Amino acid sequence: MRKSMGITVFGCEQDEANAFRTLSPDFHIIPTLISDAISADNAKLAAGNQCISVGHKSEVSEATILALRKVGVKYISTRSIGCNHIDTTAAERMGISVGTVAYSPDSVADYALMLMLMAIRGAKSTIHAVAQQNFRLDCVRGKELRDMTVGVIGTGHIGQAVVKRLRGFGCRVLAYDNSRKIEADYVQLDELLKNSDIVTLHVPLCADTRHLIGQRQIGEMKQGAFLINTGRGALVDTGSLVEALGSGKLGGAALDVLEGEDQFVYTDCSQKVLDHPFLSQLLRMPNVIITPHTAYYTERVLRDTTEKTIRNCLNFERSLQHE
């Protein structure tokens, strides 16, 4: 009989816990499920397991990594595509490997298309009016994608999936990326901004892309253009965005991510007063759609992320056996 391997899963939400419990027997693993995010204080809960899993909102600092090393952890698998939340330099220095999971880009691509359609059809205003039993057509006349040019910034897996979907709508598609990864009409960023009716962001956040869309870039965009962001909040200078929306320079925005969202995303804040410089303004704007960083979140992605996390840990354990 194969010996079961243990994995300590930190920051484990109820739906993730159910997925781990369902899949664990198939892989002969024993998960220790902990709802609290990983920290230097609770790292000791991983004692006895060489592999742990963390969520993408868990900040894994140097102090936390040191605490993990002390209890014998050798591998951190984050349940996310990126690992900006982990001090990978400290992990490498302490001999702890870090792994990520890649999931299907379709969930985010579908969501980005949904947000585009909602934005250009004025869905927020329409839904609000109907909720008030106002069924008039005042100010609800929308636009059609086939009549528009869409600029896709970033043509990695998600950007490529977005381009593929847009072609089905018959609209013109422009693309910008540091490398040409697909057959597409690639242009420089300033040309994309000047010629796109919709701009959608699909690049990772790093020093070079922080505030990629700032005051100057917004100034280059077409009058009445729409901005869609399902990437990372800090890709956009939110202050400049709010100013452009208020002045009418931009026709609208649909944001699944927002700069400074860490204080409220994935939390019921209905009874709280949030100290965010722009959230309340954006929520009041009839042409702005805000959603809670949920573009990726589907049943398929939950299962895929859980399964790939388990496989990452199993593969790491096997690699140790062959050293």
From Swiss-Prot:
PROSITE patterns: D_2_HYDROXYACID_DH_1 (PS00065), D_2_HYDROXYACID_DH_2 (PS00670), D_2_HYDROXYACID_DH_3 (PS00671)
Keywords: Antibiotic resistance, Cell wall biogenesis/degradation, NAD, Oxidoreductase
Keyword Ribosomal protein: no
One Gene Ontology MF term: NAD binding
EC number assigned by the record: 1.1.1.-
Active site residues according to the UniProt entry: R232, E261, H293 (proton donor)
UniProt-listed InterPro entries: D-isomer_2_OHA_DH_cat_dom, D-isomer_DH_CS, D-isomer_DH_CS1, D-isomer_DH_NAD-bd, NAD(P)-bd_dom_sf
Domain of life: Bacteria
Induction annotation: By vancomycin, mediated by VanS/VanR.
Coiled-coil region: none
GO biological process, one term: response to antibiotic
Residues reported to bind NAD(+): H157, I158, T230, G231, R232, D256, H293, T294, A295, Y296
SUPFAM superfamilies: Formate/glycerate dehydrogenase catalytic domain-like (SSF52283), NAD(P)-binding Rossmann-fold domains (SSF51735)
Major enzyme class: oxidoreductase
Protein family per UniProt: Belongs to the D-isomer specific 2-hydroxyacid dehydrogenase family.
Purpose: Required for high-level resistance to glycopeptides antibiotics. Catalyzes the reduction of 2-keto acids to 2-D-hydroxy acids that give rise to peptidoglycan precursors that terminate in the depsipeptide D-alanine-2-lactate rather than the dipeptide D-alanine-D-alanine thus preventing vancomycin binding.
Name under which the protein is recorded: D-specific alpha-keto acid dehydrogenase
Biological source species: Enterococcus faecalis (strain ATCC 700802 / V583)
Gene name in the database record: vanHB
